[in-house]
Amino acid sequence: MPTDLPYAAEAESSLSPDELEVLRRQYYREIEQGHVTIQSKFNYGWGLIKSPSPELETEGVKLLQEIYSASPDHRRECTYYIAVGYYKLRNYAYARKFNNLLLSVEPGNMQAQSLSTLIENAVKRDGLVGIGMITGAVAVVGLIAGSVWKRSRR
């Protein structure tokens, strides 16, 4: 699902497994030492969000939300990536919520504006897919009901 939006590339690019492993090792080394820096936690959360795995993306959102809740000084930098994580997880309501939060403070933020476009396009696309599935299901039910009705009239 590549995008033509230059600022939204972040939402659709991934880290290599080796790059993610470097961030993971740093984060867990600090856990073993008994003190995790906000920067290491942020870097690892960011890396997890840039993973192609929904499980890892979910973990990344969780780490960034922990920073968001515990450290008001780091909320701005977490807000965009939390929105990206929710977008990648197809949780568009939360993606929109966090992205709009950032846009309310920084209306000119090009990354957030591009992400907003991606979110809205995804909502429309998923809505059309949902309508298509419902229409197909109704058609099948109609065919079955018509067939049953036709047989009962014989």
Swiss-Prot record:
<feature type="repeat" description="TPR">
    <location>
        <begin position="76"/>
        <end position="109"/>
    </location>
</feature>
<dbReference type="GO" id="GO:0060090">
    <property type="term" value="F:molecular adaptor activity"/>
</dbReference>
<keyword id="KW-0812">Transmembrane</keyword>
<keyword id="KW-1133">Transmembrane helix</keyword>
<dbReference type="InterPro" id="IPR028061">
    <property type="entry name" value="Fis1_TPR_C"/>
</dbReference>
<dbReference type="InterPro" id="IPR016543">
    <property type="entry name" value="Fis1"/>
</dbReference>
<dbReference type="InterPro" id="IPR028058">
    <property type="entry name" value="Fis1_TPR_N"/>
</dbReference>
<feature type="topological domain" description="Cytoplasmic">
    <location>
        <begin position="1"/>
        <end position="127"/>
    </location>
</feature>
<dbReference type="GO" id="GO:0005741">
    <property type="term" value="C:mitochondrial outer membrane"/>
</dbReference>
<comment type="function">
    <text>Has a role in mitochondrial fission. Has a role in outer membrane fission but not matrix separation.</text>
</comment>
<feature type="transmembrane region" description="Helical">
    <location>
        <begin position="128"/>
        <end position="148"/>
    </location>
</feature>
<dbReference type="InterPro" id="IPR011990">
    <property type="entry name" value="TPR-like_helical_dom_sf"/>
</dbReference>
<keyword id="KW-1000">Mitochondrion outer membrane</keyword>
<keyword id="KW-0802">TPR repeat</keyword>
<dbReference type="Pfam" id="PF14852">
    <property type="entry name" value="Fis1_TPR_N"/>
</dbReference>
<dbReference type="GO" id="GO:0008289">
    <property type="term" value="F:lipid binding"/>
</dbReference>
<dbReference type="Pfam" id="PF14853">
    <property type="entry name" value="Fis1_TPR_C"/>
</dbReference>
<protein>
    <recommendedName>
        <fullName>Mitochondrial fission 1 protein</fullName>
    </recommendedName>
</protein>
<feature type="topological domain" description="Mitochondrial intermembrane">
    <location>
        <begin position="149"/>
        <end position="154"/>
    </location>
</feature>
<dbReference type="InterPro" id="IPR033745">
    <property type="entry name" value="Fis1_cytosol"/>
</dbReference>
<dbReference type="GO" id="GO:0005778">
    <property type="term" value="C:peroxisomal membrane"/>
</dbReference>
<dbReference type="GO" id="GO:0000266">
    <property type="term" value="P:mitochondrial fission"/>
</dbReference>
<dbReference type="GO" id="GO:0016559">
    <property type="term" value="P:peroxisome fission"/>
</dbReference>
<comment type="similarity">
    <text>Belongs to the FIS1 family.</text>
</comment>
<keyword id="KW-0677">Repeat</keyword>
<keyword id="KW-0496">Mitochondrion</keyword>
<keyword id="KW-0472">Membrane</keyword>
